[in-house]
Amino acid sequence: MTTDAVQTMIPTLDVTERPAPRPKVEAGVKLRGAEKVARIPVKIIPTTELPKKPDWIRVRIPVSPEVDRIKSLLRKHKLHSVCEEASCPNLGECFSGGTATFMIMGDICTRRCPFCDVGHGRPKPLDVNEPESLAIAIADLKLKYVVITSVDRDDLRDGGAQHFADCIREIRKLSPNVQLETLVPDYRGRMDIALEITAAEPPDVFNHNLETVPRLYKAARPGSDYQWSLTLLQRFKQMMPHIPTKSGLMLGLGETDDEVIEVMKRMREHDIDMLTLGQYLQPSRSHLPVQRFVHPDTFAWFAEEGYKMGFKNVASGPLVRSSYHADEQAKLVKAELLGS
């Protein structure tokens, strides 16, 4: 297999450990871009400009009455969508189709992953009214499939697991037929209590992204652990064998195709049912640089290999994100699991 990829930037990571200044950050203050990544242990040298995207990765500007309507509804209920916070390239398509991925527990993350466009800082206390507000918004939108994700909340005793459970419970009160997928954080140091809470109010699909290959964790996911994330997914599957588990990777951070295949094998060893693979897009000059744009043919090859390994569904393409067409993927996988 010859990888057909467009190589773009020379790596600009300085992996030398360096002391980072630690000015006190006030609660509720969101750090983004250079301010955010200045606090990680690996120095990132800003690129002079963002790389030019190939033709296959360009998307239309998300402008339509439906996009405006959903944004207005989110503001009305003081909710956040990861579609906006993470600058998702599929925002226009998903919003225009009347769907959205909701981000709970605020819009300030306690982690500072330099690939991500969500702000970092000291979060405010949880909004106790958010589960009810989210349930009302979903009922107003008449959604049939909802993805709930969150910022990392390392400040919470359970990592936010109870808040996820509260949201699921309130949503099902008002929309009993809705299908719910949760895209959860890694619950670092809190796995036991988080899984106990999750099992009491489980979603219809349990998703947690590995994001990248283990060699790049120090640069891309400071504060996270590759094996911990795999174990989280496997332990949930052992507790709830009929609920699909799902994970995903971004490509273009400097990984090799062989490394991607190895991670896919490890996912299957940990009983992960569904896989998403998409192209990493650099949110700003201060974020991790794009090392390559992976050709659609290579994404198609990864999908073929994934099905050979036993994944029940593989979504692999330049614009694929973890919640992209999640309803269609989950329907097929759940039917197979329930029939097995």
Curated annotation (Swiss-Prot):
Its main location: cytoplasm. Keywords: 4Fe-4S, Cytoplasm, Iron, Iron-sulfur, Metal-binding, S-adenosyl-L-methionine, Transferase. The keyword S-adenosyl-L-methionine applies. Its EC number is 2.8.1.8. Its cofactor is [4Fe-4S] cluster. [4Fe-4S] cluster 2 binds at C109, C113, C116. It catalyses: [[Fe-S] cluster scaffold protein carrying a second [4Fe-4S](2+) cluster] + N(6)-octanoyl-L-lysyl-[protein] + 2 oxidized [2Fe-2S]-[ferredoxin] + 2 S-adenosyl-L-methionine + 4 H(+) = [[Fe-S] cluster scaffold protein] + N(6)-[(R)-dihydrolipoyl]-L-lysyl-[protein] + 4 Fe(3+) + 2 hydrogen sulfide + 2 5'-deoxyadenosine + 2 L-methionine + 2 reduced [2Fe-2S]-[ferredoxin]. This is Lipoyl synthase. The lineage of its organism: Bacteria, Pseudomonadati, Pseudomonadota, Gammaproteobacteria, Pseudomonadales. The gene is lipA.
